[in-house]
Amino acid sequence: MPLRRITTLALALSATAATLTALPGAAAARTSETLRWKPCAEEQRQPAETPKDAQDAKGGEGAEVPELPPLECATLDVPLDYADPGGRQIEIAVSRLASEKPERRRGVLLTNPGGPGIGGLGYPAILAASGLPQEVRDAYDLIGFDPRGVGRSTPVSCGLTQEQQDRGNFPTWAHTPGDVVREAEGAREIAERCAASPSAPLLPHIGTADVARDMDRIRAALGEERVSYLGASYGTQLGTAYASLFPGRGDRIVLDSNLGPGGYDHRAMRMLARGLEDRFPDFAAYVAAHPEYGLGTTPRQVRATYQELARRLEREPVQGWDGTSFRGVTFDRLYVDANMPELAKIWQALDTGGPVPEQPPFPDVEPFMSARFAVICDDSPWPRTIREYQRDVRVDSRRYPLLGGSTANIGPCASWPRSWVKEPVRVDDQGPSNVLLVQNERDPGTPLAGAKALRRAFGDRAVLVTADQGGHGVYPFGVNGCANDAVTTYLTTGQRPARDLACAAEPAE
């Protein structure tokens, strides 16, 4: 598998968009269907369905996957188009890890690991096997699901070519205005292929608002008046959408590693570059403290090595690695502290010409990439002109020199069919005060700035807990006991911090 594919697709799994239609929220609750549970097949609960960072958060690259508890599975029919609830129906795959303590059970906890384009059917098992406190497992039935368009729910496919799949969500670095023009050609071809695909009738209807309405259908099918929620990364935007569309049906809402109130929009894509700037000093300090890598003895020298290696690989790739894949793997590995030694070895090999550590293969990613493009592009209007992206590249290359010339470059959303694009939902302070935001301060995939913006948008509905840590994902995979305890306390007792809470740094175990 080409190295660019590995790194760009890993990046595509990172930050994750909520532009929501203005259909009445109540429309999603009218269902008398119940879920018929049966044991999930083994492959339905595998960790491949969850983000790489969630799998590796405890042990880093090559960590042993814990034994997973068995799940129950069911399917739920929902309208393809909620504006036409009696029209075509599609299937949503749902899973359950039931509480084993009925006397302590207080409800259901709907979960989502992020994305978009990633299934969450196996996520309850991953949470349980990765340290979710027993008191939370006792208090809730853990509910997972594959969002529409993904996995074992009704899927979508644009029929992307291998080259289009390899592009991932990570455009090449644009050094000149002409580079943006060239990138636009490939991006437009992806949008056109999606519009001409057999999945075209489904693609306008798999955005975040549609998934949020599916979540309310799941709630109703479970027979619950209200549902609690735990969502990470892009899952925070699903939770934001649900809390905004159905404010009276949310119980305890926990959003971990937060996108801003605009979700995975054009601004969020550009903010990935800020995320790397926030996170990179942690890695630079690690490398500088380990002179055996030969990559610099001060953080400033390590940063200079990054820039020099990226330029060199763009001129002359090494073992299939170019500047784009080098930047991508750096971004990806910095999701988890435990990956820093492996990343330093990759840098060292690329610098010296030694063998690069073998990278794990990815499964078939065409459905993932198709669903990802569709959700992101459906969810909000993106700039349509090449000139706007040329301007953004010029600005971000200077502002965020580690990654800005890539993340500001043009993508398929610039050419997405206009009739498919929705307007975002309004996120405001109207509703119950039942949202807990939790966020690492130096998160590359969902930077702290997004969490602060979402906190402002929610007003008194939300409290923000920050952890003086680096990496993507806090609960329950992270090491910060203060932040983890705040989430567990809220889920089990309903008590949030009285005001925004800043948790001090804690060392990795």
Spans of features found by a protein language model:
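Catalytic-loop region of hydrolases
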Residues: 2-11, 18-173, 177-181, 300, ...
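Alpha/beta-hydrolase fold active-site neighborhood
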Residues: 28, 300-433, 479
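Glycine-rich nucleophile elbow surrounding the catalytic serine of serine-hydrolase chemistry
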Residues: 119, 212-213, 231-243
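A catalytic-pocket lid/entrance helix-loop region that shapes and gates access to the active site
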Residues: 131, 157-169, 243-301, 345-354
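Alpha/beta-hydrolase fold nucleophile elbow
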Residues: 222-234
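Conserved strand-to-loop "acid loop" that flanks and positions the catalytic carboxylate
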Residues: 436-442
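Conserved alpha/beta-hydrolase "acid-adjacent" motif
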Residues: 444-450
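Catalytic histidine-centered segment of alpha/beta-hydrolase-like enzymes
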Residues: 464, 470-481
